[in-house]
C-alpha cells in the first residue's frame, strides 16, 4: 500500500472543517502518516460565495487546481462525500492518472437520475419560508447553518454543468474504488454506480442515512482500511 497524500472533498452545504476535521478524519489520517489535502469548494466554507450561477462553472477546475497545489504533481488517494464524491469521479474520469485509490460515499443511483431537477432544491434554499416538502425543508434549513450563504448555495446548484458524469467517463476510472452508501440514503442504491466502475467494491452502512454518513464509524474504518491507513 502507498503513502499517497489523501485528497478530501466535502459535500454540498458543508465544508472541509465540518465534514472531515470535526468528524476526526484529518487527525486519523495524520496519525497514519498521510498528508491531507482538504479544500473547500467555491461557495462553501472559507471560499468566496458569489451569487451568480455562472461563477460556479469552474468548480471542478478549481478542485483540480487545489489538488495540484497540494500534491505537487504526485498521485493522490481520495475520499469524497456526496457532492465531493461526484466531483472526484468527474476529475478521475478525465485525469485517472492523478489518483491511486478512491473512496466515494453518499452517491449512487442519484448520479443517473436525469429527471432530478437541481432547480427544485435551489428554489427551496432561496425561499423565504420553510418549504412543506421534507427534503426541501431540510436543505432550506441546512443552507442557513452558520457560515453558509443560502443565495450562494442556490447559485451553486443552478450552475452550468461542464464536467458531466457519463458511462464512458466512469469506464475510464480503472482504479480501485470503494463505494460506501447508507442503507437509508436517498442517493442510493449504489449498485448502478458500482456496475459502471471497472474495479469497484460496495460497502453498505446499516441504519445510516445520507447526512449521518461522514461520522459513521463503519465508514471511517472501511475507508481507512481501503487506503491502508487504518490504525
Annotate each predicted stretch with a short phrase.
Residues 58-76:
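Conserved acidic catalytic loop of the alpha/beta-hydrolase fold
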Residues 10, 80-85:
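Conserved alpha/beta-hydrolase "nucleophile elbow" surrounding the catalytic nucleophile
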Residues 173, 179-181:
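Short beta-strand/loop motif that positions the catalytic acidic residue
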